[in-house]
Amino acid sequence: MDRRVAAVGDLERRIGHRFEDRELLERALTHASVGDGAKKVRDNEVLEFIGDRVLGLLAAEALAQRFPKAKEGELAPRLNALVSRETCARVARKAELGPALRLSASSSKIGGRETDSILAGATEALMAALYQDGGLEAARKVFLDLWNDEFDRAGEGRPRDPKTALQEWAQGQGRPLPTYRVLDRTGPDHAPVFTVEVSVTGVDPAIAKGKSRQEAEKAAAKALLEREGAG
C-alpha cells in the first residue's frame, strides 16, 4: 500500500472520523504547492479559510462553557492562543497529520511536512472538511479531543506586551482596534521624551510618556488597561 494512503487511513482512525466524501478529505490534505500550473489541482486554501471560522466558533463555544463567569476580555487571549498558528501546528503533530499531506516534491524535500505554516493551514482545512462531511458535531468532537491539552496551555499566565493585551481586550469588548497619537516630543535629540495618547472607542483615552515612541505607546496601553481593570 502507498505510504501516504496508509497515513491518511491512520489519520482517520486517530481522529475517529471516517470521511464519506473522500474527495473532500483529499482536498483538505492537498497543499497549494501541488500542481505545475498546467494541471489544475483543488488545494486546501479555501477550506483553510472556512476552517479558521469553524475553529474560532468551536474554541469560543468551549471557552464560554469552561469559564462561564469570565468576561469577554479575559476569554479573548485564550481564544487567540487556541487558534494560533503555533497551536494548530502542535495539534497537527499530535494527530500525525504531516505524513498524510499531499505536497509538491520540492516542498516535501525541504521539510514541508514539518513546517508550522503548512501544518497549521492543513489543520484548519481538516476542521472545515469535518464540518462539511459530518456537521458541526463531528468537528466539535475532534476539536475537543485534539485541543484538550491546549486549554491549560492557553491559560498560562505568560507576560504579554501591553499593546497586544490592549488589542485583545478591545477585540473582546467588540470595539475597534486601539489607535495611538504622538501629542508631544520634548528634550534634546540624545534624550527625547515622547508623549503619546492611546484611544479605544467608547472609553476615555490614556496618555503616557516614554524615552521612545514605542515605550510611550506601551506605557499608555498599560495605563488604559489598568484604569479599566484589565491590566
From Swiss-Prot:
The keyword Zinc-finger does not apply. Residues 210-231 are annotated as: Disordered. One of its GO terms (molecular function) is double-stranded RNA binding. This is Ribonuclease 3. Residues 212-231 have a biased composition (Basic and acidic residues). GO terms for cellular component: cytoplasm. It catalyses: Endonucleolytic cleavage to 5'-phosphomonoester. Mg(2+) binds at residues 48, 124. It is found in: Cytoplasm.
